[in-house]
């Protein structure tokens, strides 16, 4: 079983300038996993990317990881 919270945390820490500020909240509702990624305000642009491309890529990778366990994932960035 893939630890989605740790996967998202690792991806985000690799992108941002302040990896210490990265945290992830997880809530599970059946097969649906809701993840909220918190990053420093200065790093928000790096995580979202131009026109949201980085955020979309992160969500795509997380969906692929979740589908391996027949789960659905929702990633919110704050």
Residue ranges and their predicted role:
Residues 54:
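An amphipathic, aromatic/His-enriched active-site/gating alpha helix that lines ligand/cofactor pockets
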Residues 1-46, 57-78:
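RNA-contacting regions in translation and RNA-metabolism proteins
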């Amino acid at each position: 079983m893939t630890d989605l919270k740790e996967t998202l945390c690792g991806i985000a820490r690799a992108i941002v300038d302040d990896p210490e500020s990265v945290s992830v909240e997880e809530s599970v509702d059946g097969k649906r996993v809701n993840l909220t990624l918190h990053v420093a305000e200065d790093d928000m642009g790096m995580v979202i990317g131009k026109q949201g491309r980085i955020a979309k890529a992160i969500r795509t990778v997380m969906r692929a990881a979740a589908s391996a366990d027949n789960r659905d994932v929702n990633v919110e960035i704050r």
